[in-house]
Every structure is written in C-alpha cells, then in structure tokens.
Amino acid sequence: SMEKFHPRSFNMGFSQEVLKATGGFSGLRFGEDIDMSIRIMAAGFKTCLLPEAYVFHKRRTSFRKFFKQVYNSGMARINLYLLHPHSLKLVHFLPACFVIGCLLCLLGGIFFSWYCLLPLLLLIFVFFIDSWRLNKSIKVAFLSIVAAFIQLFAYGIGFIHAVFAALILK
C-alpha cells in the first residue's frame, strides 16, 4: 500500500485549527516538517498533495552544501524514529547499506580482486546512461553521478552516525 503523503515545510500549508491542535512546529532543527506531518495525521487531520500548486524553493548552490543538507536528513531520520518509532521504514536503511556496500566493494577491489569493483562500475554506468538519456548532456550525466553518490553517501553516513550516537553509544 502507498504511504500517506507527508508534506514538507517548504510547501506545507495548514489551517489555524491544525496549528492549534498540534502546537505548530517542534524545536527540531532537521526533520521538523516530517514530525509536523506525523502529528497532523495523529491529530486526525488529513494531508494531501496538490500537484497543480506551484512552489519555488532555493536549491543548494554547491555539492558541499548539498552534502550537509542530506547528511542532516539522514541524522534527522533517527531523531524522528525516537519521537515516532512507527515512522522508520526499511527504505530509510538503504543509503546506509549503499555506503557499507561501496566500502566493501572498494576494500574487496584493493585486497582481493578488481572484480569486486564491478558493481560500483556498473552503477556508475547506469547513472551516466540514464542521466544522459534524460538530459541529453554529457556534462549533466557526469554531474549526476557525483550528485547521486553525494546524496546516497551523505544520507547514509548521517543515518549511521545517528544510529551510533543516539541508539548504540547513548
């Protein structure tokens, strides 16, 4: 079944009634929008996506800023789990598995056989071809590889960091 839509703060609108019933945004620095969405639904209100609504929000201007944003999202997922245990799904673990898988491929390539690098090379090839097909630009295709790895690594590392900090070493 499809998950319920959780609006994000950059495009979220709600009534004064919802604001009063939920108490508004929590003090979370990251993940505050998902926390608010969960509390809205827990208070008995419905959420929906309005595909015709036009929303503009500022994109990150560098890969460094993008990494930081996505890293914080990975950490926020564990903080959300602590507040709302039912909100953590299997899909949230995938970037962490990607990080571990990449490290195992690299270590295998260094210490065993270059064949261990084949899964990474295949993934890079798939990212490149898919982006090139969609965007018709070799430059964008190469940047897509970088962006995809940054997104997956940043979220995965943030998630792993939060698991250790909040759950294992607490």
Where on the chain are the PLM-derived regions?
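Conserved nucleotide-sugar donor-binding
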Residues: 8-23
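Membrane-embedded multi-pass helical conduit in multi-pass membrane proteins
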Residues: 98-169
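A cross-family signal for key residues in well-ordered alpha-helices
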Residues: 16, 20, 38, 100
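Short, P/G- and charge-enriched loop/turn segments at secondary-structure junctions
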Residues: 1-3
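Catalytic donor/gating beta->alpha subdomain of glycosyltransferases that bind UDP-sugars
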Residues: 26-88
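Membrane-interface anchor segments at the N-terminal boundary of transmembrane helices
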Residues: 87-97
